[in-house]
Amino acid sequence: MKGKILILLILLIPFLLLGEERREYPCYLLREAPILDGKEEKAWENIPEATGFFILGGEKYAMEKQTYFKCGWRKEGIYLLIKCEEPSIDKLSARLKDGEELYREDSIELFFFPKDAPNYLHLAVNAIGSRWNEIGITGQPATPWNWQAKAFMGKDFWAVEIFIPFGVLGRKASDGEKWLINIARNLNTGPTSEHFTCWPPLRAGFHEVQNFAFLTFRERGLSFEEKGKIEEEINKPFYAFLKVIVEGLWRDLEKQAGSYREAISYGLGKEKLREEANYLNETWNELGKLRQRENPSLNELRSFILKYPNLPERFKEFNYKVLLEKLFEE
């Protein structure tokens, strides 16, 4: 376990060093303006999706409930589609209305710092589409400016679609221009460890401007093939992190392969151990197949990790059960 943590920290060092590399999202032109309804439609199909939100503190990724976003622009302003994983959709905290302190509920917070602007803009949207905004950090509710947000609740997620005119942002963007941005999430349904998450790996709070990500405007559209490659590049750090976990699980099991295989074989022949032996055997086989795949997707890696938590510990516990069973037989 210590080895895994060390590898993880090495992977994250570039993000943790103040003033060093920032995360960057390339914001491409939308071919058409999306219909604001919180749903993903054709207008978004060639815009890359980013994920890999960090738990506030910048050292760990959110694993149980991730967040995804797409961001594109047109001459009139910036559009965003943000999707929040939420299997406990009925437990959402989202009642406040426009202008109220939405960051206290299940919500998304957006921070934009346009190039050469004197201050940044802070916007918030809750899971029912209510809006809130301020300039800089005042913490005071304000009458929402002229920007739009619409929410949608699915079976195991909620989403918001947002349009922010350049007039609200204080200036228009141009090709190659870099703004600073933070996209953050307030999660009230648990786990408590993921209460505050954000796309840039911020340390102490969402207003940590010095560690915001870059939003780089690109004055062209993307083909579907280009979109896929850019999406892979954006999410490469999170993908690498998941690969490290999967490889670590495999190494842990292979170290005790002989003992574990023997325990599983024994357990399959015992009625009271058979169910767990089958589970562990199938899990091991599934892990092996996942590793053999040339390029498993990010979602496949994460799904396996979430589906089989505490895997090495379960194998160890089962091994002990088998040893005890054999002792009683004697």
Show the residue positions of the predicted features.
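Sec-dependent signal peptide recognition
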Residues: 2-10
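Hydrophobic h-region of N-terminal signal peptides that target proteins for export
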Residues: 10-18
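Structural preference for beta-rich elements and adjacent junctions enriched in aromatics
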Residues: 20-330
